[in-house]
UniProtKB/Swiss-Prot annotation:
The keyword DNA-binding does not apply. Expressed in uterine cells and PVT neurons of the tail. Expressed in pharynx, intestine and DVB tail neuron. Its EC number is 2.1.1.244. This is Alpha N-terminal protein methyltransferase 1. Disruption phenotype: Causes significant increase in synaptic transmission including 55% increase in amplitude of evoked postsynaptic currents and 102% increase in the frequency of miniature postsynaptic currents. Decreases total and motionless sleep due to increase in the frequency of active events during sleep-like state. It catalyses: N-terminal L-alanyl-L-prolyl-L-lysyl-[protein] + 3 S-adenosyl-L-methionine = N-terminal N,N,N-trimethyl-L-alanyl-L-prolyl-L-lysyl-[protein] + 3 S-adenosyl-L-homocysteine + 3 H(+); N-terminal L-seryl-L-prolyl-L-lysyl-[protein] + 3 S-adenosyl-L-methionine = N-terminal N,N,N-trimethyl-L-seryl-L-prolyl-L-lysyl-[protein] + 3 S-adenosyl-L-homocysteine + 3 H(+); N-terminal L-prolyl-L-prolyl-L-lysyl-[protein] + 2 S-adenosyl-L-methionine = N-terminal N,N-dimethyl-L-prolyl-L-prolyl-L-lysyl-[protein] + 2 S-adenosyl-L-homocysteine + 2 H(+). Transmembrane segments: none annotated. Alpha-N-methyltransferase that methylates the N-terminus of target proteins containing the N-terminal motif [Ala/Pro/Ser]-Pro-Lys when the initiator Met is cleaved. Specifically catalyzes mono-, di- or tri-methylation of exposed alpha-amino group of Ala or Ser residue in the [Ala/Ser]-Pro-Lys motif and mono- or di-methylation of Pro in the Pro-Pro-Lys motif. Probably required for the synthesis of neurotransmitter melatonin from serotonin, which plays a role in promoting a sleep-like state, called lethargus, during larval development. S-adenosyl-L-methionine binds at G71, R76, D93, V94, V95, L120, Q121, Q136. Keywords: Methyltransferase, S-adenosyl-L-methionine, Transferase. Belongs to the methyltransferase superfamily. NTM1 family. GO terms for cellular component: cytoplasm.
């Protein structure tokens, strides 16, 4: 989430291993989940709620039955964003200790569904289960090929009319940047748009996060639908 200084290409498995090590060491609280930027929590959740409400008004997904939180950690987004909207929420994270901590952070709530402990590079959401798949501040850990493959698997996880939302930092530099601390890339918007196209996803809505400090790279939200649904870009 922070600034980075490199655009080097890395071996995927090496990056995944080091990223998992980084998050395994993170403090198991909101500050840890936000990389030391706890003050981002309130404006982040507020903007995300507005984005979901906007998607509803545009009829970009039909129901609020089932959502999936990818890179859920202790459940910050699950608890404060998805549970207020959806009847059931599944969680995914590569670090088992963080998923386990969610029992304390959220509590034993009947609206929490399955908890998947697996990296996104191999994770396949259950097919045709979700009205919304939310992917926040985690896509930068995937190399390009794995990101596209993951998006394709997410599309299969959607119910008819379902929607994927990607929320992540976007660099204004000409090339992506690599963060040597958490081992993630901050991609350019053209790179993200190419990944959407390669995944046969249409971008049906997008928004810029507001209220963040200037030293944070811009954060954007993209709503995506499989191309066969017939929606066009907004």
């Amino acid at each position: 989430m922070s600034s980075s200084s490199s655009s080097r290409i890395h071996n995927g498995e090496d990056v995944y291993e080091k990223a998992e090590e980084y998050w395994s060491r993170a403090s198991q609280d909101v500050n840890g989940m936000l990389g030391g930027f706890e003050a981002l929590h309130a404006p982040d959740i507020s903007a995300s709620k507005r984005f979901i409400e906007g998607l509803k008004k545009k009829n970009l997904f039909g129901y609020f039955d089932y959502a999936l939180d990818c890179g859920a950690g202790i459940g910050r987004v699950t608890k404060h964003l998805l549970m207020p909207f959806f009847s059931k929420v599944d969680m995914e994270d590569v670090v088992e200790e963080l998923i386990t901590k969610s029992d304390q952070y959220i509590g034993k709530h009947p609206r929490i569904g399955d908890k998947f402990v697996e990296g996104l590079q191999t994770f396949a959401p259950p097919e045709r289960r979700y009205d919304l798949i939310w992917i926040q501040w985690v896509s930068g850990h995937l190399v390009d090929e794995d990101l596209v493959d993951f998006f394709k698997r997410c599309a299969k996880g959607l119910k008819p009319g379902g929607c994927i939302v990607l929320k992540d930092n976007v660099t204004n530099h000409e090339k992506r940047l690599f963060d040597d601390d958490d081992h993630s890339w901050t991609r350019t918007e053209p790179e993200l748009l190419k990944a959407f196209a390669d995944s046969q996803l249409d971008m049906v809505s997008k928004a810029l996060q507001t209220g963040f400090p200037k030293e944070i790279y811009p954060v954007k939200m993209y709503a995506l639908k499989p191309q066969h649904t017939g929606f066009t870009n907004n």
